[in-house]
């Protein structure tokens, strides 16, 4: 069984060149408490990002982590081969087109905050007085 070549399993690092351009892609990141691999530990914590969801597990053995990474790499290879060549990063172009005007966004946020604050104040006042 051959694992993904650009994934260093000994350091448990996932390559930084991976583009997560769709919500149904899989990526795996394993983290330890100190950041350095600890060979004495039987199991370690792992964080899995799958289909737009984040899952945590604190009892994953080294063999299980390798299996998860292997399955994820096979799924990514299958999806990339079915799409042909790698598509451009859609998420960055989407975010650039969807960024609102910062001033308008701040104004809308402030108005929403003030409205909610007004409602909270009215709800907590003993006589529900209107101002």
Swiss-Prot record:
Domain of life (superkingdom): Eukaryota
SMART domains linked: TIFY (SM00979)
PROSITE patterns per the UniProt record, alphabetical: TIFY (PS51320)
Residue window of motif EAR: 9-13
Feature: compositional bias, Polar residues: 79-100, 122-131
Motif annotated as Jas, chain positions: 105-127
Domain Tify: 39-74
Keywords: Acetylation, Jasmonic acid signaling pathway, Nucleus, Plant defense, Transcription, Transcription regulation, Ubl conjugation
Positions occupied by motif Nuclear localization signal: 106-113
One GO BP annotation of this record: defense response
Gene induction: (Microbial infection) Triggered to degradation by the pathogenic Pseudomonas syringae HopZ1a protein in a COI1-dependent manner, thereby activating host jasmonate signaling. Up-regulated by jasmonate, wounding and herbivory.
Chain positions covered by the region annotation Disordered: 14-44, 74-131
Documented effect of changing residue 9 to A: Decreased transcriptional repression activity
Post-translational modifications: (Microbial infection) Acetylated by Pseudomonas syringae HopZ1a. Ubiquitinated.
Pfam family membership, one: Jas_motif
Subunit field text: Interacts with TPL and weakly with COI1, but not with AFPH2/NINJA. Interacts with MYC2, MYB21, MYB24, TIFY10A/JAZ1, TIFY10B/JAZ2, TIFY6B/JAZ3, TIFY6A/JAZ4, TIFY11A/JAZ5, TIFY11B/JAZ6, TIFY7/JAZ9, TIFY9/JAZ10 and TIFY3B/JAZ12. Interacts with RHD6 and RSL1.
Record-linked PANTHER family: PROTEIN TIFY 4A-RELATED-RELATED, PROTEIN TIFY 5A
Domain commentary: The jas domain (105-127) lacks the canonical jasmonoyl-isoleucine (JA-Ile) degron LPIARR that strongly interact with COI1 in the presence of JA-Ile in other TIFY/JAZ proteins. The LxLxL-type EAR (ERF-associated amphiphilic repression) motif (9-13) is required for the interaction with the corepressor TOPLESS. The jas domain (105-127) is required for interaction with Pseudomonas syringae HopZ1a.
Function: Repressor of jasmonate responses. Unable to associate strongly with COI1 in the presence of jasmonoyl-isoleucine (JA-Ile) and is therefore more resistant to JA-mediated-degradation than other TIFY/JAZ proteins. Repress gene expression through direct recruitment of the corepressor TOPLESS to cognate transcription factors. Interacts with and suppresses RHD6 and RSL1 transcription factor activities to negatively regulate jasmonate-stimulated root hair development.
UniProt similarity note: Belongs to the TIFY/JAZ family.
Miscellaneous section: TIFY5A/JAZ8-mediated repression does not require the tify domain, which, in other TIFY/JAZ proteins, recruits the corepressor TOPLESS through the adapter protein AFPH2/NINJA.
Protein name: Protein TIFY 5A
Source organism phylogeny: Eukaryota, Viridiplantae, Streptophyta, Embryophyta, Tracheophyta
Gene: TIFY5A
